[in-house]
């Protein structure tokens, strides 16, 4: 039957990508339908019980700055919080949280069920309704047809999924869930380029059978013995009192006996016997892959992570495996503290279809089928955080195409590489594609000094407001913070000290040496050995801000007052901006030089095969990938700065719109530097 109600946006799949996509489209005012094979598993953490980490935490903060759910759900479900790289610069500091699976899933479900404009429906999708070259809806396994203006596919590992344990394998989307075989076949019928990838998960352990006295304890920040006495929050709107009771993680190690056991199972490993065709994640390898690749290492650290407050289940992070169960049993029991460990669920690898993200437009709409958007593992990525960010992004663009009424004046929203890690993620996928599951690192962002966790709201919340993603409460909180940062920055610039009014003793106490001429407090704060608190102690606190002079205790994990938290956040932002101003200014100059190419749209009718000045390889790659801008073209593998210059010459001679007036140009080199050239 044809369902009588029509929708603006249909989202297929209720994982981390699907839930963020559906919430985003609904927040923008679109009538949105979320289809899932099982609404009891909406927001389920299929693998590890954690959110965030290096690069990944940055994405979560960006999703949150745009009104997304992941960070807020983690604050409500997180049972351990840590700031990674806390001793390093702010650009690479990252929040990571262990989450109670049930609490996290419940927090996501609650948001979905209370979101206006959002409908849930439990049915697996087997087919897409396509008219001409445009999608117009989806068909469920029961034959129910739902019509919509746009469709977002977020199928995760379900597309023709196959689970491997040793030499045994069976069809599944994940353990306990059926695969989406018919939907995968339908996508292949549409001639969308696809491949196979794989990922894996470790066996789960019963905590009652673990001897924790033989393991190392790893408490979180704000817990007794933690690295910091201050407990973090993930969301910009989060509060520490939202966190449930906290738990420690634990560590153990593999040993030579463990490695011998693993090697003894290589002849029955689906990885080494050719049973698995898909490529696995380089940065989250299986334990058998680690032992094979790093044969010189005699030990690997394993983290025992609690799955929740109401379960004894533990996730042994570091021993993801598809080895036969008898090998899994033996390798687990070969480690200290796990000699009597009981396995609750076996580890496994899962192989699944993905579709080449280079066939997507920059909005994540497929080039072949109008109105069809992809997000998450279907694009070749791995990780909850990468999926959530893509889901929000695809949901926004699907909503814009469906006619969302917002103050955004453009047909699509695509953040630049200098604006967000989400922009880096999108650009990497559509220009470089994937040959293995893609995960985010801070090293992928050339402008990472600007793309910090602490300023994700400063970068994106105003855009989110224009897109209709940000509610009044978040907007008011953000505006208050932004105004306070601006006021304090200007105040520090306006206050001056000189040798006349600052004694040498006082100067040496705070600044390390006496000053020789007049300085503003903003200038002094730029010094690496001067922090805000010390600066405000000058002359008995004479220069302290009445607005921000609220003490925050760092001696105990007690919950500080909201005003003290606000003051600490503002002070952190003021101090970081002051200390990194020179570096950030240089990056802004680089962004400006590159912006010319990002704004030069390549003509849709351009036949690259006829640009005879280009090498055959360059013509082939440009024809295949059809980059939307000159900036995208410059980042394609095999496209050199010389090729970009030659392409510019051709465009100018051919009088394509926007290129006829080109004169002196700056062609980006493969290293990202800028080279001067003339055409």
From Swiss-Prot:
List locations, semicolon-separated: Cytoplasm
Any GO CC annotation of this UniProt entry: cytosol
UniProt entry keywords in alphabetical sequence: Cytoplasm, FAD, Flavoprotein, NAD, tRNA processing
Which PROSITE patterns would you find in this protein's record?
Answer: GIDA_1 (PS01280), GIDA_2 (PS01281)
User: Which residues make up the binding site for NAD(+)?
Assistant: 280-294
Cofactor(s) required for function per UniProt:
FAD
Query: Is Cell division tagged as a keyword?
Result: no
Pfam families assigned: GIDA, GIDA_C_1st, SAM_GIDA_C
The entry's FAD-binding residues are 13-18
Q: Which InterPro entries match?
A: FAD/NAD-bd_sf (IPR036188), GIDA_C_N (IPR049312), MnmG (IPR004416), MnmG-rel (IPR002218), MnmG-rel_CS (IPR020595), MnmG_C (IPR026904), MnmG_C_subdom (IPR047001), MnmG_C_subdom_sf (IPR044920)
Highest taxon of the lineage: Bacteria
The Swiss-Prot or TrEMBL record annotates one GO molecular function as:
flavin adenine dinucleotide binding
Q: Which GO terms describe its biological process?
A: tRNA methylation; tRNA wobble uridine modification
The residues the entry assigns to the signal sequence are none
| Protein family membership | Belongs to the MnmG family.
What function does the entry list?
A: NAD-binding protein involved in the addition of a carboxymethylaminomethyl (cmnm) group at the wobble position (U34) of certain tRNAs, forming tRNA-cmnm(5)s(2)U34.
**Known partners and oligomeric status:** Homodimer. Heterotetramer of two MnmE and two MnmG subunits.
**UniProt protein name:** tRNA uridine 5-carboxymethylaminomethyl modification enzyme MnmG
Q: Which species expresses this protein natively?
A: Albidiferax ferrireducens (strain ATCC BAA-621 / DSM 15236 / T118) (Rhodoferax ferrireducens)
